Amino acid sequence: MCFLLLCLTLTLAGTGAVPTGPSIEIHSRIIGGWECDKHSQPWQALLTFTRKHNSVCGGVLVHSQWVLTAAHCIGDNYKVLLGLHDRSSEESTVQEARVSARFPHPLYNMTLLNLLLSHKMNLTFFYKTFLGADFSHDLMLLRLDQPVQLTDAVQVLDLPTQEPQVGSTCHVSGWGRTSQNYENSFVLPEKLQCVEFTLLSNNECSHAHMFKVTEAMLCAGHMEGGKDSCVGDSGGPLICDGVFQGIASWGSSPCGQQGRPGIYVKVFLYISWIQETIKAHS
């Protein structure tokens, strides 16, 4: 379920070596999934934008004029597509919008993100700077230039009314990367992909990743590996037992590794911020 990229594989300077531990991707991705039923995810948005290069993320329509995505999907020249299933065909259901304003969560560490995106670094600097780094609050609201028309293929997804439970059955969707093979990193699916897995305890993710896993995050995936979101899926929805609960945020690289589930923003904790931001800027 990935699309172009906002992918971060942390490469080191000098010899071109990489960290001895797993690389980090600040973008979730879809591995081990299947083609979603057409328009079964009518709230799904595809975002294309620029930030040094062309990039892609997912998003969620939470209001007729607002899309929720990940803060690390920040960029310029956004194009938002809704009602899309197959990127390779002209679909009459597609609505295209531009973004008139963007509102990343004020507590998201954009300085740390920019450092991660812009630097080639030696091993010592990498671990000193990013071991235990906190990428909480990875949310951003995008105001569209005009409201979209709600149809069978374009629908608003309701915010959660209660927290998810560990053990819930969840799925995530997107056009992000579908291969764990980095030689195929630019081979992205034309059709919207879905993958299903389980909501795990945060302790399981805390032991699996070098970034900090906080109470503002959700841990989801298969401990056996092989099923995951991937590069290009970031910002897309995590739906657990039929309820919108998370936004795809980050995970290990390559995607879908055994013992390394993905990390999602816990949307329930941000309902007030989402509602207040929309009310203040509509």
Curated annotation (Swiss-Prot):
pH dependence: Optimum pH is 9.0.
Signal sequence region: 1-17
Record localization: Secreted
Entry's EC annotation: 3.4.21.-
Pfam families, A to Z: Trypsin
Source taxon at top rank: Eukaryota
Glycosylation: residue positions: S100, N109, N122
Tissues showing expression: Submaxillary and sublingual salivary glands.
Active-site residues per Swiss-Prot or TrEMBL entry: H72 (charge relay system), D138 (charge relay system), S234 (charge relay system)
A biological process term (GO) from this entry: zymogen activation
GO cellular component, one term: extracellular region
Keywords of the record: Disulfide bond, Glycoprotein, Hydrolase, Protease, Secreted, Serine protease, Signal, Toxin, Zymogen
Propeptide: 18-29
Chief location of this protein within or outside the cell: secreted
Disulfide bonds: C36-C194, C57-C73, C170-C240, C205-C219, C230-C255
The UniProt record lists the keyword Hydrolase: yes
Gene Ontology molecular-function annotations: serine-type endopeptidase activity; toxin activity
Family matches, as PROSITE patterns: TRYPSIN_DOM, TRYPSIN_HIS, TRYPSIN_SER
SMART domains named among the record's database cross-references: Tryp_SPc
InterPro entries per the UniProt record, alphabetical: Peptidase_S1_PA (IPR009003), Peptidase_S1_PA_chymotrypsin (IPR043504), Peptidase_S1A (IPR001314), Trypsin_dom (IPR001254), TRYPSIN_HIS (IPR018114), TRYPSIN_SER (IPR033116)
Function according to Swiss-Prot or TrEMBL: Has kallikrein-like activity, converts kininogens to kinins, and has dilatory effects on the blood vessel walls. Shows highest activity toward Pro-Phe-Arg-MCA and Boc-Val-Leu-Lys-MCA in vitro. Has preference for Arg and Lys in position P1 and hydrophobic residues in position P2.
PANTHER family, alphabetized: KALLIKREIN-1, KALLIKREIN-RELATED
Family membership noted in the UniProt record: Belongs to the peptidase S1 family. Kallikrein subfamily.
Protein name: Blarina toxin
Organism from which the protein derives: Blarina brevicauda (Northern short-tailed shrew)
Gene: BTX
